[in-house]
Curated annotation (Swiss-Prot):
One of its GO terms (biological process) is chemotaxis. This is Motility protein B. Changing residue 242 to T/V: Complete loss of motility. Its main location: membrane. It is found in: Cell inner membrane. Changing residue 217 to W: Complete loss of motility. The chain crosses the membrane at residues 28-49. Belongs to the MotB family. Residues 1-27 are cytoplasmic. InterPro entries: Bact_OuterMem_StrucFunc, MotB-like_N_dom, OmpA-like, OmpA-like_sf. Disulfide bonds: none annotated. One of its GO terms (cellular component) is bacterial-type flagellum. Changing residue 32 to N: Complete loss of motility.
Amino acid sequence: MKNQAHPIIVVKRRKAKSHGAAHGSWKIAYADFMTAMMAFFLVMWLISISSPKELIQIAEYFRTPLATAVTGGDRISNSESPIPGGGDDYTQSQGEVNKQPNIEELKKRMEQSRLRKLRGDLDQLIESDPKLRALRPHLKIDLVQEGLRIQIIDSQNRPMFRTGSADVEPYMRDILRAIAPVLNGIPNRISLSGHTDDFPYASGEKGYSNWELSADRANASRRELMVGGLDSGKVLRVVGMAATMRLSDRGPDDAVNRRISLLVLNKQAEQAILHENAESQNEPVSALEKPEVAPQVSVPTMPSAEPR
């Protein structure tokens, strides 16, 4: 028994593998994070030192569609070659040339932003003043193609003027004097127009009519604005429209057609009015050279055989 062989027991032990390589993966993630942070602060620094003109060019670059860039459409630059230009030969026009931003379009956007801010200021003024808040149904403020339009509308229960005259009622006076200082906040000029209903005068169009009444009411509104503090020279035009531009489809004699329209003009509308009333630079027709008339040559014709 002592010489009996005992079975050999083999024990396999797994050696613990070193995780040194895995433990260093955080360094890669940290390096990526630091690279991203460096790129972020680099972009912020470049934005802070860039001029407004350069910022506009950068924005236009990122707004350029990929299809436009591939097909060679209108890009941020007008160069004939995608390769940046260089060299000492200034007579060559090929190469990358900076495209100037559309200054006129930028001015229009800024002006539109000013008009929207003015509308917000007027709404805030109306809401903050209990007296004006009660008159909110008589005010209509909207943005139109010519600028910001403020309409003060009449009603049967509360007219703006005394019947058939240009005497301003107290509530109308309060509105005009309250909005006058707000209008001084922007450089845009103003056009005032008076409107009436279609109810005719007994004397007809030959005497005092709705034309005179609408013009007188518009001018009376101008005076109240000046009393309220409107800057001199702010008003560009005062016109009377009579009943030619109805506001409501309920009838030509509806009370809402009696109104004062105050238009804060944008630059384009202002230039159109100035051009309309400017002295014409064209030469009179009599001063123009007469076109030369080619000499007429008479050609004998053959007599027709039969009348048709």
